[in-house]
Amino acid sequence: MSQAGVERLLKGLQILVLVLRLSAGYFPEERWNPESPFRSPTVLIAVLARNSEGSLPEVLGALDRLHYPKERISLWVATDHNFDNTSQILREWLINVQNQYHHVEWRPQEHPRWFRDEESPKHWSHSRYEYVMKLRQAALTSAREMWADYIFFLDADNLLTNSETLNLLIAENKTVVAPMLESRAAYSNFWCGMTTQGYYRRTPAYMPIRRRERQGCFPVPMVHSTFLIDLRKEASQQLDFYPPHADYTWAFDDIIVFAFSCRQAEVQMFLCNKEIYGYLPVPLRSHSTLLDETDNFLHTKLEAMVKGPQVHPSSFVTIPKKVPDKMSFDEVFLINLKHRQDRRERMKRTLYELQIDFKLVDAVYGKMLNQSNVTEMGIKMLPGYKDPYHGRPLTRGEMGCFLSHYNIWKEISERNLEVSAVLEDDLRFEIFFKRRLQTLLHDLEIAKLDWDLIYLGRKRMQVDEPEEPVPGVRNLVVSDYSYWTLGYLISLRGARKLLNAEPLGKMLPVDEFLPVMYDKHPISDYSSHFSTRDLRAFSVEPLLLYPTHYTGDKGYISDTETSVLWDNVTQPTDWDRAKSRKTHQQEKLRSEALNTPSMGSPFDNTARDEL
């Protein structure tokens, strides 16, 4: 540093010392400490629950974990017309947490259990809409009377997985703002378009926001289910849920009534998708049962665990212990590599939530196999085999995957297991998985179908012609050429057919081997090495299992493609997987190739739905 630079530095230090001395005060009585920060704004959280026994433990657990000073929060909780234990769960939780919060208001109504004009517990009748509007208005009035800064409405089946949600919404400084909630479909808690009659209107703006291709806080005509109102804003005094505005002529629906109130008050609603805030279930049809509702939320919870950590219930409510079973299978096998502990823990928790008992099988880690292991097991690659997309030979990862399944087939044969299920650890379950699978097993028994293997999840590779439906068995087709072994059912006879083919001496990837064995592989040279190809293979339709991730997704990991060659451990195989169709999503099928439609969806195509 030059002499001039040193002098400037010393002068700066002298000025800094002088400033510090002045702030300390010349006399002791002039010294002062910096001002303390503002306290967090006060928030009233309003929860309205009806027949929400299946979702409340996790939803309340998410409230427990919110990073916000509890002493600055008041709780306003109402429940009514319940057939289940909603009231008991809420009462227990409130008793246990009430001392943590500034104020608690509890409004239960035990009787009657139904509205006079409703057809089922899921039916939104005129009386039910009106009652919900009155409850929301009562919560809003309570917040105003206690001079709360904000009111935060949270539906009893909306799962907040982001503990900073409340802080993030407050920081947006909007009069009405909602966090975008994820679901299994395109459905979410906002609209991008509204007709002149107040109904939902599909717009090109919706999907880019829903997919988070555009991120930010967007002005929208409708938010619902979970949203924050800033009561400090002057315009918020004109917002009401009930009675509807004097000029209101639209549908008698609580979310539309409030959207109209915002419009009349010239208050813009905003939807934020800057982060993953939480999840909500897709609405069911009005004739759905409470069991459907419970399973619907269970699926929401499982989807949340695919993308994030485990979802835990509140520690302040009593949770009945689940009793897993094998669903009439002789065994349910779960394949997992020991070092993939995140997948192992997620699948263990998921299967527990589904109440499915299973046997954990440590997968064979192909990279740990040395040449002597390979030689000792008599493993040789199928002559002429090349990966269809990269032209490479078999990888150690694919070898390990094959051996993992092969070892299960051996165990099935040795233990004489008549019917088994095999699951990998990188899958997600479709809604109503267990019930749909139980229905399939029942139909198989009634139809006396002669089967060896049934795909529960796969990638259909033959996309030109429809597959043959199976008479007498709903949701089942004869399987054509397919990829993936995410999950399948296998009979004792099927396992022995695969073993009798002696595949270790002519190995190819397991999801290429299976189509060879049911004689649907398009490359006849591969099939020619196996003289007996009579495996009776089928597939559920629609599928019950899908991968958790596809190529290009955040968090995608492949232990089969990201490996080394089977006979050359110095040659890595992590080629450009963007060119590999194998790990991409199912290609769109031509209309003439679609399989015969089976049972209808349990979801409504309603005005709120974005399916």
UniProtKB/Swiss-Prot annotation:
One GO term of the biological process aspect: positive regulation of collagen fibril organization
Swiss-Prot/TrEMBL keywords: Endoplasmic reticulum, Glycoprotein, Glycosyltransferase, Signal, Transferase
Catalytic activity: (5R)-5-hydroxy-L-lysyl-[collagen] + UDP-alpha-D-galactose = (5R)-5-O-(beta-D-galactosyl)-5-hydroxy-L-lysyl-[collagen] + UDP + H(+)
Entry protein name: Procollagen galactosyltransferase 1-B
InterPro entries linked to this entry: Collagen_mod_GT25, Glyco_trans_25, Nucleotide-diphossugar_trans
SUPFAM superfamilies associated with the record: Nucleotide-diphospho-sugar transferases (SSF53448)
Region spans: Disordered: 576-611
GO molecular-function terms, A-Z: procollagen galactosyltransferase activity
GO CC term, one of those recorded: endoplasmic reticulum lumen
Family: Belongs to the glycosyltransferase 25 family.
